[in-house]
């Protein structure tokens, strides 16, 4: 028989009755110090009013005074604290009604009870939460819910009965706990020189030491129940809350976030098991809810190489966030002030998307160790090294299509609305250039950003937080107070909630954006270098207000600054002279940072140096190119003074990456003495063409992240290339919180946008308005004038027709590639053989430029290309290699070689005496690439070759179109080569310096030779247009762009043969060679000059306004890259009309790529170029490129 108290009288009786307040099962199976069962009687000091708030797990700290919202009795100060469930705010000696039996309890010290609160967080919340000493709890609100009775009989409750709500203590099973058979002798301690205590184990022997170690057993986490019980004030259990209500309350009660109280609204007089009881529940936020939560170092749970599953801390954050959100919705709590972000983004949708273990976004697919079978099935190659020119920044599925890119453009326009109203600021007199009005406005904005006067007010609410108000807890019988809407709420009743992380705070979370810098994203050719140079002159060395760098880094991904190497204790080298002792030397006293570090592509390093020299008054700004063999000791470079002072250091992304890798290898060595870029803090860090760091996982990005600088700037015309996460990398570099935190950025920027949540655009706009300045050439100022007045630009697309031989080679190659693709697609193996398909597409694009390019190997795809070349052999059709060899060598001449001599002797005199340019009989235009027929008539090479091919297609004998003599074969044609002597301006100016018997400088030498059939259709079109330009403007300069350096080689040889002067600029050249090329191209000349330039190496950043003709020889995968190439010429400083010519071949992949660019994706695929073999293009796009789209029509213009 068990002794119990009657629910009516409190007297003991010997019969079964409801469970007691502390059930015996709570302490079963635990090793603990037992306390005898005692009957606690009420004392005089017992409060007449019982508080019915329940806290789980642990007690609050002692000594806390009366709270603002509820008066409670003092807790007694004793050393042992009850770790079971207790009533908050009551003396343990007086918290139980008379006759209640207190069950055994486990003792734990107060210090131990609260030791688990000292973790850290990566969320942008105040580092140390400020909780008022008198704060105990705040009334959040109340709601009505149902409960289920677990008791039978009368007297348990009635309408108005106050109830106490509690949770049964959770238990976890430790598989690795000591076995019951082993004796625990208490804590380990030292007694008489011997270690005693602890669980006894076997003695360690040599055999046991050599035996295989057994991994410790993992703790088995017990499943969390959702049972919340409620009892009356006399301690008798009445029932439990419904599962629907208990679902979101369970976690909050277990973690001590909330306290609950309530009363019965309605219930049956005679309770039965399972009957419904209507309850009114009051919810209070406890003091513990505002303590540090979720603060942890990122390194403790995130590793690129470790298992990327959700950690326990992340799970706790997610459960807390979801539970609080459900609670707020259940009570109907609304914020009194929403952040700017909350006003533009649907929090509900963002939070729903954050459910589950993907708190860190796409970490799973970022790990190389978690490659799936599906990825292997798609034929992805191994991860390649990321260089400066080409990087992958994420999954192909997250690329933005044309519609989404247009939405990004609209964001830019909205963010630019207020830019025309910026004030204008003049640079100091040491800056020699005159800024345009929009550049002066940019200087105003940049200066304000560096001074900390950003548009975001320091006292504005943090964009991730919302402001709420505690309600007034109305006691029963008190009149209901109606607050005035105009009345300012009491500041002590305010609290703040972060719906994205679940954190709560009593302190106002300000939007303290400590970043001093931003993104200058003006369109290409608007003078970003000039504007940054003016800023360097405006803001020189100054004393920093504090360690701003460390402050900003703390809020971004939990990173922690290491101690600079220059401040560490250094050691001299150990030698015999110092007797093998390491002698510490005092750290050097560093001056305030004064130098600006500019990181740019290697092709722009010399340009930065030259531009700074031209724009600066002599001696005001000294710059140094830190690259290659010129990398002197950085410490000595920064320590220079006077004439040796260096204000700007210019380096390349490749050099910085190399320095970063070296620093990682040596920085932790005990004898490391510094001397790296990463051991010094710079006044300003500038990333030119900053989209080079768009891949957050690339080594070049990490190298930029680690740089130390007080101010940070990113210069790029394309902050978002093709993914929203391109923007994240810039924000992370700039230390802009919270957007520089990847989990936050992905949670409510990337994922909502990809889910077509259009309100996510407003979030991006909100971000950009605070840190980005972007103007375009088409924008107008406040007076309606264009902010940039540039000469007109004319873009012409020349659609060319293949020659007969080229068409045969291309069709042969296309049919084989298409046949192979159809076979793979039919078998469902297209994507698993993706690399092979890309190799075939590459060969097609090369064949369009010149058939000889197909013979070359393209990196790792060369072997696949060889298979294509050999295809068709043995089936009577010949193979592709033989066809190209026939094309390159022409038809072998059947006439002997001595025919040339007699042939030439007869006509050379006549040709040399002619002064007028002859007219072609076939095209009725001036002859280009003049050839001589056996009948002495002449024609354009293209015209007569096409004429002969047409006759052969019609099974006719080719004859001369002028006289009808024939037959004519290609071997019978002779090329008329007229070479004009180059004019020497020095000797030509002084007739005495020339031999009077010599011929005039305008004399032309005429020779005959075999017809060169190696030139392609595009090459002939280029030469024809260059010849026209030479006739119109003898001093013209032009750029010829191609993505294939092998094609540039062929163009180079052809220009040399034609006597046209050229220069070369590509990725194989050193920085010094590139600088010399640009310098040579900029010099004045009296003859045409052509710059052959690689699209990848010279497509961005260069200032080539000395030219005004641009030729794009092939179609690039991204139209924006082509536009960047054009802007090398059409930019500030250009005073001539710009003419752009794009060559495409009708009926080829070029036409189809352009169609896809314009109509669908604007991003066919980077994998169509060399090296990008890990992308995924949709099958639909591949079919269109192969010409398998039914809508594809050859009748289109292109």
Swiss-Prot record:
Enzyme kind, highest EC tier: hydrolase
SMART domains the UniProt entry points to: DEXDc (SM00487), HELICc (SM00490), HIRAN (SM00910)
Domain Helicase ATP-binding: 509-737
Domain Helicase C-terminal, first and last residues per copy: 1021-1180
InterPro entries: Helicase_ATP-bd, Helicase_C-like, HIRAN, P-loop_NTPase, SNF2-like_sf, SNF2/RAD54-like_C, SNF2_N, SNF2_RAD54_helicase_TF
Residues the entry annotates as binding ATP: 522-529
Biased composition (Polar residues): 59-76
Designated name of the protein: DNA repair protein RAD5
Organism lineage string: Eukaryota, Fungi, Dikarya, Basidiomycota, Agaricomycotina
Gene behind the chain: RAD5
């Amino acid at each position: 028989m068990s002794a119990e108290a009657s629910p009516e009288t409190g007297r003991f009786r010997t019969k079964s009755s409801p469970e007691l307040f502390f059930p015996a099962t709570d302490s079963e199976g635990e090793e603990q110090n037992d306390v005898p069962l005692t009957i606690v009687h009420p004392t005089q000091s017992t409060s007449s009013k019982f508080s019915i708030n329940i806290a789980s797990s642990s007690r609050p700290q002692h000594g806390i005074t009366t709270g603002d919202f509820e008066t409670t009795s003092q807790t007694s100060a004793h050393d042992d604290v009850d770790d079971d469930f207790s009533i908050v705010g009551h003396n343990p000696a007086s918290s139980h009604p008379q006759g209640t039996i207190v069950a055994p309890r486990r003792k734990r010290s107060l210090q131990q009870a609260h030791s688990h609160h000292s973790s850290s967080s990566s969320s942008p919340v105040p580092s140390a939460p400020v909780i008022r000493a008198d704060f105990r709890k705040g009334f959040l609100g109340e709601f009505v819910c149902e409960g289920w009775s677990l008791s039978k009989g009368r007297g348990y409750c009635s309408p108005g009965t106050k109830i106490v709500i509690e949770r049964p203590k959770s238990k976890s099973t430790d598989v690795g706990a000591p076995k019951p058979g082993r004796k625990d002798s208490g804590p380990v301690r030292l007694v008489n020189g011997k270690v005693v205590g602890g669980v006894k184990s076997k003695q360690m022997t040599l055999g046991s030491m050599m035996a295989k170690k057994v991994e410790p057993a993992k703790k088995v986490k017990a499943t969390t129940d959702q049972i919340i019980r409620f009892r009356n004030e006399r301690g008798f259990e009445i029932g439990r809350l419904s599962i629907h209500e208990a679902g979101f309350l369970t976690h909050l009660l277990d973690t001590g976030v909330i306290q609950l109280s309530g009363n019965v609204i309605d219930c049956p007089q005679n309770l039965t098991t399972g009957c419904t009881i209507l309850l009114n529940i009051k919810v209070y936020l406890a003091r513990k809810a505002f303590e540090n939560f979720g603060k942890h170092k990122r390194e403790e749970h995130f590793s690129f190489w470790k298992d990327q599953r959700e950690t326990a801390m992340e799970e706790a954050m997610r459960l807390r966030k979801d539970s609080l959100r459900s609670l707020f919705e259940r009570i109907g709590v609304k914020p009194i002030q929403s952040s700017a972000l909350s006003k533009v983004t649907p929090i509900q949708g963002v939070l729903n998307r954050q459910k589950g273990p993907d708190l860190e976004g796409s970490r799973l697919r970022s790990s190389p160790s978690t490659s799936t079978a599906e990825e292997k099935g798609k034929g992805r190659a191994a991860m390649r090294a990321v260089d400066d020119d080409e990087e992958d920044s994420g999954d192909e599925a997250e690329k933005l299509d044309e519609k989404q890119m247009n939405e990004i453009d609209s964001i830019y326009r909205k963010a630019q609305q207020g830019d025309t109203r910026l004030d204008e600021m003049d640079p100091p007199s040491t800056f020699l250039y005159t800024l345009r009005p929009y550049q002066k406005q940019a200087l105003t904005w940049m200066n304000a950003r560096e001074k900390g006067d950003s548009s975001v007010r320091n006292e504005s609410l943090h964009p991730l937080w919302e402001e709420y108000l505690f309600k007034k807890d109305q006691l029963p019988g008190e009149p209901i107070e109606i607050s005035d809407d105009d009345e300012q709420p009491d500041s002590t009743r305010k609290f703040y909630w972060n719906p994205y992380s679940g954190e709560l705070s009593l302190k106002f979370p300000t939007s303290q954006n400590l970043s001093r810098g931003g993104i200058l994203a003006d369109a290409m050719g608007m003078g970003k270098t000039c504007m940054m140079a003016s800023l360097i002159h405006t803001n020189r060395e100054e004393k920093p207000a504090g360690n701003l760098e460390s402050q900003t880094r703390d809020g971004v991904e939990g990173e922690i600054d290491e101690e600079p190497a220059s401040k560490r204790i250094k050691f001299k080298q150990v030698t015999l002279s110092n007797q093998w002792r390491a002698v510490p030397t005092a750290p050097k006293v560093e001056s305030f940072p004064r130098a600006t570090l500019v990181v740019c592509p290697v092709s722009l390093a010399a340009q930065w140096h030259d531009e700074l020299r031209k724009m600066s008054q002599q001696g005001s700004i000294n710059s140094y190119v830190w690259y290659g063999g010129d990398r002197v000791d950085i410490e000595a470079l920064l320590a220079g003074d006077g004439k040796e002072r260096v204000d700007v250091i210019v380096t390349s992304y490749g050099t910085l990456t190399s320095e970063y890798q070296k620093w990682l290898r040596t920085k932790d060595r005990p004898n490391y003495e510094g001397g790296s870029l990463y051991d010094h803090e710079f006044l300003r860090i500038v990333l030119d063409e900053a989209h080079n760091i768009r891949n957050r996982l690339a080594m070049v990005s990490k190298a930029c992240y680690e740089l130390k600088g007080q101010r940070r700037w990113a210069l790029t015309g394309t902050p978002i290339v093709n993914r929203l996460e391109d923007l994240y990398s810039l924000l992370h570099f700039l230390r802009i919180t919270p957007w520089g935190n990847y989990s936050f950025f992905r949670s409510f920027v990337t994922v909502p946008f990809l889910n077509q949540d259009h309100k996510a655009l407003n979030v991006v706009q909100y971000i950009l308005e605070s840190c980005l300045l972007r103007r375009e050439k088409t924008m107008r100022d406040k007076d309606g004038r264009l902010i940039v007045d540039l000469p007109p630009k004319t873009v012409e697309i020349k659609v060319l027709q293949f020659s007969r031989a080229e068409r045969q080679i291309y069709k042969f190659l296309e049919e084989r590639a298409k046949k192979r693709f159809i076979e793979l697609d039919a078998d469902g193996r297209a994507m698993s053989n993706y690399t092979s398909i890309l190799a075939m597409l590459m060969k097609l694009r090369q064949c369009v430029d010149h058939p000889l390019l197909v013979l070359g190997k393209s990196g790792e795809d060369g072997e696949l290309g060889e298979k294509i070349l050999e295809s068709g052999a043995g089936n009577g059709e010949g193979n592709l290699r033989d066809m190209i060899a026939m094309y390159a060598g022409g038809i072998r001449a059947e006439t002997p070689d001595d025919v040339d001599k007699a042939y030439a002797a007869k006509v050379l005199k006549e040709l040399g005496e002619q002064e007028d340019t002859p007219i072609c009989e076939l095209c009725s235009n001036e002859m280009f690439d003049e050839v001589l027929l056996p009948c002495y008539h002449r024609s354009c090479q293209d015209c007569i070759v096409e004429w002969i091919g047409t006759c052969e297609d019609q099974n006719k004998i080719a004859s001369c179109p002028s006289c009808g003599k024939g037959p004519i074969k290609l071997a019978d044609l002779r090329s008329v080569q007229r070479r004009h002597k180059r004019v020497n301006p020095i000797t030509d100016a002084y007739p005495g310096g020339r031999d009077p018997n010599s011929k005039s400088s305008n004399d032309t030498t005429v020779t005959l030779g075999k017809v060169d059939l190696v030139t392609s259709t595009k090459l002939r079109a280029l030469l024809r247009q260059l010849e026209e330009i030479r006739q119109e403007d003898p001093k013209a300069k032009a750029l010829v762009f191609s993505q294939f350096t092998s094609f540039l080689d062929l163009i180079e040889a052809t220009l040399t043969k034609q006597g046209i002067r050229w220069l070369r600029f590509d990725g194989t050249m050193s920085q010094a060679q590139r600088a010399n090329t640009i310098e040579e191209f900029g010099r004045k000349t009296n003859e045409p000059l052509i710059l052959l330039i690689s699209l990848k190496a010279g497509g961005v950043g260069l200032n080539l306004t000395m030219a005004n003709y641009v030729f794009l020889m092939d179609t690039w995968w991204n139209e924006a890259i082509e536009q960047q190439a054009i802007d090398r010429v059409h930019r500030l400083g250009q005073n001539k009309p710009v003419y752009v010519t794009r060559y495409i071949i009708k009926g080829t992949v070029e036409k189809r790529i352009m169609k896809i660019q314009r109509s669908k994706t604007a991003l066919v695929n980077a994998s169509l170029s060399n090296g990008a073999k890990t992308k995924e293009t949709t099958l639909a796009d591949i079919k269109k490129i192969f010409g398998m789209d039914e809508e594809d029509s050859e009748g289109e213009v292109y």
